């Protein structure tokens, strides 16, 4: 399980107990977040995907079912592209593959642009402030995954968003359309936190996807 920007494994408090009854759950704080430190000046999703692959190697796990939320969904997608042998199936909720306004709900990116313009020349005085800006810049500049690059993903994927998500439905649909073996689930009456707002349904649906013998290219109503 891979959490979102600025989060930690606590993001999955509504999900880990369910999945732990059937799976060996692996959850770690991503670098520069939660209890994990990162002294470097910048972050990339590619590096974070490599971290996840290295974690599996360290634990002597050949491949895993991967669930990612928000930035964690981006990391999951990068993991499937960079280390295809590590991913059995992938479920990503609230993920984007471009950092510009086209990926987000109307007006949302404009607020981030104002924040960027206000803070881009600031000199941060503390490690906490520098780390917070590093995480902001991660999402401001990244990801930059061309839609046609998603054609390389070989594993079955469940692409998820809420119908009131931060990520636009149109962007989510384009991700789904460009992955060869993918299913799409737009969660009704949900914002970005699909896995929290609709935890029971989310857990059962993702579990069903992971445990099904085959994956079909279809949209879940």
Task: Give the predicted meaning of each segment.
Residues 1-35:
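Conserved HGGG/HGGXW glycine-rich cap/lid loop of the alpha/beta-hydrolase fold
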Residues 13-14, 27-67:
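Active-site loop/oxyanion-hole signature of alpha/beta-hydrolase fold enzymes
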Residues 74-82, 88-118:
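Flexible "cap/lid" loop of the alpha/beta hydrolase fold
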Residues 133-149, 155:
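Active-site nucleophile elbow and catalytic-triad environment of alpha/beta-hydrolase enzymes
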Residues 153, 159-161:
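Short beta-strand/loop motif that positions the catalytic acidic residue
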Residues 166-171:
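Conserved alpha/beta-hydrolase "acid-adjacent" motif
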Residues 172, 176-193:
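Catalytic histidine neighborhood in serine/cysteine hydrolases
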Residues 189-221:
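Catalytic active-site module of serine/aspartate enzymes centered on a nucleophile-bearing elbow/loop
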């Amino acid at each position: 399980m891979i959490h979102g920007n600025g989060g930690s494994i606590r993001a999955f408090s509504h999900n880990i107990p369910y999945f732990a009854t059937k799976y060996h759950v692996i959850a770690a704080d991503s670098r520069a977040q939660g209890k994990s430190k990162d002294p470097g000046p910048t972050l990339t999703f590619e590096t974070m995907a490599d971290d996840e692959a290295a974690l599996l190697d360290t634990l002597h796990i050949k491949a895993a079912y991967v669930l990612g939320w928000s930035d964690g969904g981006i990391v999951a997608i990068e993991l499937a592209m960079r280390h295809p042998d590590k991913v059995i199936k992938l479920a990503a909720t609230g993920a984007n593959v471009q950092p510009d306004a086209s990926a987000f709900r109307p007006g949302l990116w404009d607020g981030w642009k104002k924040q960027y313009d206000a803070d881009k020349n600031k000199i941060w005085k503390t490690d906490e402030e520098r780390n917070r800006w590093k995480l902001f810049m991660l999402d401001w500049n990244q990801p930059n995954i061309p839609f046609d690059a998603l054609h390389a993903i070989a594993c079955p994927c469940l692409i998820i968003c809420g119908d009131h998500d931060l990520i636009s439905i149109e962007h989510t649909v384009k991700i789904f359309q460009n992955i060869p073996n993918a299913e799409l689930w737009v969660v009704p009456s949900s914002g970005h936190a699909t896995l929290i707002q609709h935890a029971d349904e989310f857990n059962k649906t993702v579990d069903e996807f992971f445990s099904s013998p085959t994956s079909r290219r279809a949209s879940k109503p």
